Amino acid sequence: MTEQKLPNGFPVYVAGTTDAHHAVIVIQEAFGVNAHIRSVADRFAEAGYFAIAPELFHRDGSPEVDYDDGPTAMKYMANLTMEGITNDLNATTEFLATLGFVAADVGIVGYCMGGTVSFYAATLGTVGAAATFYGGGIETGRFGFPPLLELAPELKCPWLGLYGDLDQGIPVEQVEQLRAELAKAKVRTEIVRYAEGQHGFHCEARRAVYNEAAAVDAHQCTLDFFDVELSVK
């Protein structure tokens, strides 16, 4: 459970031991690799994974943003690019490979903007399974990525989506559009919807939107999904 830098100087938070059977990449929300994201990585480590959370805002000094400071979070998000994110994902998976974790051993999970990133990562062929918690960009692409509707047929690994019906930024209609488009993918896909879930329902630090029942179930669904889809050693 430490912060460190990869050989190329890229900062990450890591939890767990390198003799774990599998690794999980944890992709941050718009608020940085903060206490919540670190705690998520710790939970995966407690479940037996080597967890790593890359600092996607590292080009801006790896800031942590207050939950009530939306404008600042949006500013840092606006600085993200498809090229930069791809480089960061590749640096992370290449580091994991040096520890013995090949693509089939690696899961990726992302929250909010990180959910969009984890969906994109599932098209690269560098991870074995992916999960998205309320990731946007379904109809309109973000960070230079195509919309998720366009990326859906290109998925190269199993993907799990976890969405809340009360999410004001991601209407249920869009989620169901995505479900329909995912039928074109050549891999297993699954969407779980939570009737009482708002955007950010998994984050216990955001008390106004946190839903304990949905959060616990969604985390367990992710563990179960990775247990099935990642390579057996």
State what each model feature region is.
Residues 1-233:
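N-terminal cap/leader regions of alpha/beta-hydrolase-fold enzymes
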